[in-house]
Amino acid sequence: QYMLDTTLNDLNKYPLKLSDLCVMTCNLNDAPEKVVWASSPELRHDDLPNVGLQGDSYYRPMQIQGEWLPYISKVMAIDPSGKGSNETSYVVTGLLNGNIYVLDAGGFSAGYTEHVLNKLTQIAKKHKVNKILIEDNFGQGMFEVLLKPYLIKDYKCTTELIRQTTNKHRRILDTLEPLISQHRIIVDAEVIKRDYDLTN
């Protein structure tokens, strides 16, 4: 009788898998022309904290090919905290050759305070983002109005309000699943380490 790996059955139930991400050390300003994904055992990131399903893991690229080129675009997305206890969260991404590089991500529990607004501005400045996308939860653009004076003072940058009407989990699946399953999302290893340290 064959011994079945029951963890594979669990993994097949869920469309988002850590193993479909590429995890490497990303640069602030440039990225390789091509990143080749694979999930061979020798490429597994055993040094990274893993809170995914049993049997799921992070993997290094199999190959990095071509020259390192500047990102064609860098975007920061902000999801302001709502009325409950959730955080103001952000992510910074770079785009090159159809790949999205996750360069930074985090959150602040202090809501819309001066500290949070200043920190977000400094993060945008550090990464030299071209645009800041702000999810307009229900504040009629309030967060954008609060953030703009900090941007005018320290880092002039375009902002854009994004209004969402669909369920957040559905949006995550519809948007991320095609990109992740095609191994188009490449995450900086430090982002994973820091996220784990801050939430555990």
Spans of model-derived segments:
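RNase H-like, metal-dependent nuclease domains and their acidic two-metal-ion catalytic environment used
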Residues: Q1-I162, D188-N200
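Conserved beta-strand -> loop -> alpha-helix junction used to position metal-binding or nucleic-acid-contacting
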Residues: K153-Q182
